[in-house]
Swiss-Prot record:
Free-text function comment from the UniProt entry: NDH-1 shuttles electrons from NADH, via FMN and iron-sulfur (Fe-S) centers, to quinones in the respiratory chain. The immediate electron acceptor for the enzyme in this species is believed to be ubiquinone. Couples the redox reaction to proton translocation (for every two electrons transferred, four hydrogen ions are translocated across the cytoplasmic membrane), and thus conserves the redox energy in a proton gradient.
Gene: nuoA
Major location (coarse): membrane
Natural source organism: Delftia acidovorans (strain DSM 14801 / SPH-1)
Protein name listed in UniProt: NADH-quinone oxidoreductase subunit A
Subunit and partners: NDH-1 is composed of 14 different subunits. Subunits NuoA, H, J, K, L, M, N constitute the membrane sector of the complex.
Compartment list: Cell inner membrane
Reactions the enzyme catalyzes: a quinone + NADH + 5 H(+)(in) = a quinol + NAD(+) + 4 H(+)(out)
Amino acid sequence: MNIDQYLPVLLFILVGMGVGVVPLVLGYVLGPNRPDAAKNSPYECGFEAFEDARMKFDVRYYLVAILFILFDLEIAFLLPWAVALRDVGGAGFAAVLIFLTVLVVGFVYEWKKGALDWD
């Protein structure tokens, strides 16, 4: 394998990093730096903050977010499989059945443990 084949990948990585880093550096170097006490104060619709902005969230919200990500990734895995269903054959079908079985068993476990209850 020739190293010249990796040159486009290296160029792509460098351009991507440049697109992300160059605007940050230019803004830092060329931007005005005028610190002011009003810029560092908390702002809440033109008034001073009435209370601390940090609120405690229930852990169940995080659980719902994690479950959403889990099942969203499930769809991300199933979509390419569905497109290539004819090519993967019986072995691919069996692998997806095992994958779905593991997900369903995990979902039933969470359900039985009461992790999805809001009471």
